[in-house]
From Swiss-Prot:
The record marks S363 as: Required for activity. It is found in: Plastid, Chloroplast thylakoid membrane. It is a peripheral membrane protein. InterPro entries: ATP_synth_asu-like_sf, ATP_synth_asu_C, ATP_synth_asu_C_sf, ATP_synth_F1_a_nt-bd_dom, ATP_synth_F1_asu, ATPase_a/bsu_AS, ATPase_F1/V1/A1_a/bsu_N, ATPase_F1/V1/A1_a/bsu_N_sf. The keyword Oxidoreductase does not apply. Produces ATP from ADP in the presence of a proton gradient across the membrane. The alpha chain is a regulatory subunit. The keyword Plastid applies. Its main location: plastid. Keywords: ATP synthesis, ATP-binding, CF(1), Chloroplast, Hydrogen ion transport, Ion transport, Membrane, Nucleotide-binding, Plastid, Thylakoid, Translocase, Transport. This is ATP synthase subunit alpha, chloroplastic. Its EC number is 7.1.2.2. F-type ATPases have 2 components, CF(1) - the catalytic core - and CF(0) - the membrane proton channel. CF(1) has five subunits: alpha(3), beta(3), gamma(1), delta(1), epsilon(1). CF(0) has four main subunits: a, b, b' and c.
Length: 504
């Protein structure tokens, strides 16, 4: 039997003592006293911050929202079905953050930035707080670059600039998502990173949007953040902030970004659900008192940065759903007051076959012509006024028995102008073709055509102009001005097309 000598024992003991590393860890731990409906109440978490992440024994995470004298109200970032009364909860000491990187482009993720498209993990070396402060006044500059949507009605009369917040508002099934997705499709080749945030949508609707992006080649510059209708309210509430954090990552890297929130009504409803379950006092329409702050802190993150920060931008297009066209409800009025204008989609126009169903009369962009190229200003300057006068005259004509020749001509011109604003879905037009289209309508070249022929004529004109007068596109894209030479080329193309069209 082998025996250890005293000096060997001494040596082993010395080595063990030297290797001993005394770690004292202090953890903030509490116990669950109540759980259900996506809410947990915890006792014992004495030194916890508002918004701090907590971790339950079975792995579910949550966010501390209510800090009360006797307990802490936690909203769960999962179903929480395995959480038991009396189980331990650990405060992490961290605020919610997500990984960010270029690798997110082309992917579909959830509100925690975890991939849900089955294409494997996303490698990211950096992270950003989900809720970051908005850029300060000094960090910004005024909006001056156009963000082309590809929709004639918007780019000519309700222009959107890079760094602007423009609300898309309307009843359900009026084409709000179509306007937003067409805008994303039109950013192809423009160097704009797009983020589409789907909040509380049907999974089939989100799948349809993602399929459209794949088919049109838009997914390579787009990130989709999706929380479906069956997701916990906490994740539906977080999804827009996650999208904003991903867009900010690119904005601060001197890139231009576009973010769509589809839609903020669902986020407000999720927040209302959480607040009522946490027993916060309800206000108007049962929303909590800070529902304005919910949206203002999100939308203020959209900005055009100054030259010191690289002139990146984040353009936000929030969507809000109205009930029976009531824009005076709580959430619509809140978001209208936060944004730099609104695009109002009308159910009546949609049902009348005018699509996109944009009501140009009450839609407005508070940035205005600062976000238009000079050529568009020159050609489309008076078109909004002409359409407004047409709508007024049309209402009057319903009661008048006989109209004079001038009024009849004005009505005929107005009908053709309204016709040229029609566009099929997923068919955005480049700005040069939009200018040619508007010029043709406002200068009276469509007056001799039947209304049913207008769009066919314009489609053929745009093709003819592209094939026979490529210089027109070069002049507009290089000088951004509607020069005399461009006008001569366009007039020639219109006359040639009118002659060809009359022979058909």
């Amino acid at each position: 039997m082998a025996t250890l000598r005293v000096d060997e024992i001494h040596k082993i003991l010395r080595e063990r003592i030297e290797q001993y590393n005394r770690k004292v860890g202090i953890e903030n731990i509490g116990r669950v006293v109540q759980v259900g409906d996506g809410i947990a109440r915890i006792i014992g978490l004495g030194e916890i911050m508002s918004g701090e992440l907590v971790e339950f024994a079975e792995g579910t995470r949550g966010i501390a929202l209510n800090l009360e004298s006797k307990n802490v109200g936690i909203v769960l970032m999962g179903d929480g079905l395995m959480i038991q009364e009396g189980s331990f909860v650990k405060a992490t000491g961290r605020i919610a953050q997500i990984p960010v990187s270029e690798a997110y482009l082309g992917r579909v993720v959830n509100a925690l930035a975890k991939p849900i498209d089955g294409k494997g993990e996303i490698i990211a070396s950096e992270s950003r707080l989900i809720e970051s402060p908005a850029p300060s006044i000094i960090s910004r500059r005024s909006v001056y670059e156009p963000l082309q949507t590809g929709l004639i009605a918007i780019d000519s009369m309700i222009p959107i600039g890079r760094g602007q917040r423009e609300l898309i508002i309307g009843d359900r099934q009026t084409g709000k998502t179509a306007v937003a997705t067409d805008t994303i499709l039109n950013q192809k080749g423009q160097g704009v990173i797009c983020v589409y945030v789907a909040i509380g949508q049907r999974a089939s609707s989100v799948a349809q949007v993602v399929t459209t992006f794949h088919e049109e080649g838009a997914m390579e510059y787009t990130i989709v953040v999706a929380e479906m209708a069956d997701s916990p309210a906490t994740l539906q509430y977080l999804a827009p902030y996650t999208g904003a954090a991903l867009a900010e990552y690119f904005m601060y890297r001197e890139r231009h970004t576009l973010i769509i929130y589809d839609d903020l009504s669902k986020q407000a409803q999720a927040y209302r659900q959480m607040s009522l379950l946490l027993r916060r006092p309800p206000g108007r329409e049962a929303y909590p008192g800070d529902v304005f702050y919910l949206h203002s802190r999100l939308l203020e993150r959209a900005a055009k940065l100054n030259s010191l920060l690289g002139e990146g931008s984040m353009t936000a297009l929030p969507i809000v759903e109205t009930q029976s066209g009531d824009v005076s409800a709580y959430i619509p009025t809140n978001v209208i007051s936060i944004t730099d204008g609104q695009i109002f989609l009308s159910a009546d126009l949609f049902n009348a076959g005018i699509r996109p169903a944009i009501n140009v009369g009450i839609s407005v962009s508070r940035v205005g012509s600062a976000a238009q190229i000079k050529a568009m200003k020159q050609v489309a300057g008076k078109s909004k006024l002409e359409l407004a006068q047409f709508a007024e005259l049309q209402a009057f004509a319903q009661f008048a028995s006989a109209l004079d020749k001038t009024s009849q001509n004005q009505l005929a011109r107005g009908r053709r102008l309204r016709e040229l604003l029609k566009q099929s879905q997923a068919n955005p037009l480049p700005v040069e073709e939009q200018i040619a289209t508007i010029y043709t309508g406002t200068r009276g070249y469509l007056d001799s055509l039947e209304i049913e022929q207008v769009n066919k004529f314009l489609d053929e004109l745009r093709k003819h102009l592209k094939d026979t007068k490529p210089q027109f596109q070069e002049i507009i894209s290089s000088s951004k001005t509607f020069t005399e030479q461009a006008e001569i080329l366009l007039k020639e193309a219109i006359q040639e097309q009118l002659e060809r069209f009359s022979l058909q």
